[in-house]
From Swiss-Prot:
Organism: Mycobacterium ulcerans (strain Agy99)
Binding annotation for NAD(+): 12-15, 162-170, 281
Catalytic activity: acetaldehyde + NAD(+) + CoA = acetyl-CoA + NADH + H(+)
Family listed: Belongs to the acetaldehyde dehydrogenase family.
EC number(s) given by UniProt: 1.2.1.10
Protein name, UniProt field: Acetaldehyde dehydrogenase 2
Amino acid sequence: MPSKASVAIVGSGNISTDLLYKLLRSDWLEPRWMVGIDPQSEGLARARKLGLETTHEGVDWLVAQSDKPDLVFEATSAYVHKAAAPKYAAAGIRAIDLTPAAVGPAVVPPANLREHLDAPNVNMITCGGQATIPIVYAVSRAVADLGGVPYAEIVASVASVSAGPGTRANIDEFTKTTSKGVETIGGARRGKAIIILNPADPPMIMRDTIFCAIPEDADRDAIAASIHEVVAQVQTYVPGYRLLNEPQFDEPSINSGGQAVVTTFVEVEGAGDYLPPYAGNLDIMTAAATKVGEEIAKETLAVSGGKR
């Protein structure tokens, strides 16, 4: 039985490089390849120095190798991943997708990871989704017996300098995808997502506000306890994820459409592996992807785990 699952990283940009440092610390995953298309990429150069086999010949090179990875983490673009996904499937390689392609089911570790451990391809949704859907899920499960959460709204504020051209070009896709995740994974009957690119200098870390409508007679202590439990779960893979204060409960009012509301404020500070600490929005994506890969390795790839 191998001690670790073999891993390839497809993409050699900032997110892939940050992901590499997280994977190198894993007891369950062994990064062995980094695949890019630019021979001058800094990410490929760093990976080579760290002992990985690298190529600028793309996914076709990877799937042509006799020794193939157990898992691929892809951080390229939706267009590239949609073209690559069938190649991974044909080669028998499991894929963890950090792009908006959504070829496979979206996964948020505290909420639905166990449901998709056998999926050949899973998607990491969005940074806003990874940061806020766990809270919506926590509230939804606490009020499930009373009809659940009729409406949830999340506002994600990220440092403008941490948002690359892909994010800026796909704001509408971000809001649509995150809103859907608030409903299908978080459990709200209707969801809404807003992203704010904060231009502050020096940059501010990611901050998120999560509004959940709740039944007026809901057990508020149970809701707060559920939120704290889920926050603790996220902190096992994102130590910089934290509540800014206790969940705030408001009575029904005209402003809330006649519904009681619980409001939760969180912030996400990155680990600073490669990306700066203020880029918690990117860090939570690479950390959550690592968590998903580790759980897949533990549960379905027959590896024993262990230190290097």
